[in-house]
Amino acid sequence: MAAPVLGGFFFYLHLKNMEPGRGTVIKSTGNLFIVKLEDGTTVRCGIRGKFRIQGIRATNPVAVGDRVGFEWAEDGMGGIITSIEERTNYIIRKSPKLSKEYQLLATNVDLAWLMISMILPRTLTPFIDRFLVSAEAYRIPVIILFNKTDLYGTPEVEEMNHLSSVYSSIGYRCMQMSLQTKEGVQEVADEMRGKVSVIAGNSGVGKSTLINILDPAMRLKTGSISDYHQTGKHTTTFSEMFELSSGIRIIDTPGIRGFGTIDIERAELFHFFPEIFRASKHCHYHNCLHLHEPDCAVKAGVESGNISESRYINYLMMMEEEQGKYR
């Protein structure tokens, strides 16, 4: 049962005696935010225009996961957010409409789950590595979760095993799951329990379905796969934190095609590829960018097979993206 939402004329009568409130943002829809108080009640909150533009280069300065302070609105229908507590971390993406702005997807995250699939829809490595770079930059632990394993033939199994080997060797934990057969679901639930998790991945990879299986009472809308484009139709247009009956808290994020490397200097990008960063300590030049420089330990690592070629190619791709794209 959903928590009650405060508001209405009867509540307005008591506003003058109310102290400013504090809570956690559990839902974001444009300029409207649902804030959950410690007692379980929820309050609809907005933000003042001047609060939105005070040096914040985000289209939404408040995001799901934020711990905020608010004042009760004069009309008695909710509150106005006035402050945001310092964040432990956050996940961002490029704004769909403003290329020089970014959109906060989630904050104060304990664990990020990157759901991927080798089929329907197939997740590409540039998507994976862009997400991992952002997670590294903002210090969010990641588990790579392979879904739809019941649909895999020999080529898909081989690709999954290869990617698992690549990312496990770097230090990322990889797990496998089939939402159709429920294989691996309990292991995922055990890992999520007691944490605030964010689930990211291409639309259609199974994010909403996973939440429904973990707690059938949620009944989230799920999308079908487009036969023509093999891309899931977007079913989540806002971010929301779900508190499941099993003690699991999940932030469901909008369907995304890629994450931006906002606030990461080009010369520092390799810092967020752990294996490239480790190898860089042996480069001849201390300011080596691992592009065309001589005596580059990173390029030597790629040639020897110690560094994944696909990872290095994705690094080069991100380095070559036009200047100013993420700034």
Each PLM stretch: what is its role?
Residues L151-V205:
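Canonical P-loop GTPase G-domain recognition
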Residues H14-E136:
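C-terminal effector/interaction modules appended to NTPase cores
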Residues V133-I140, V166-S169, R278:
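Arginine/glycine-rich "motif VI" loop of SF2 helicases in the C-terminal RecA-like domain
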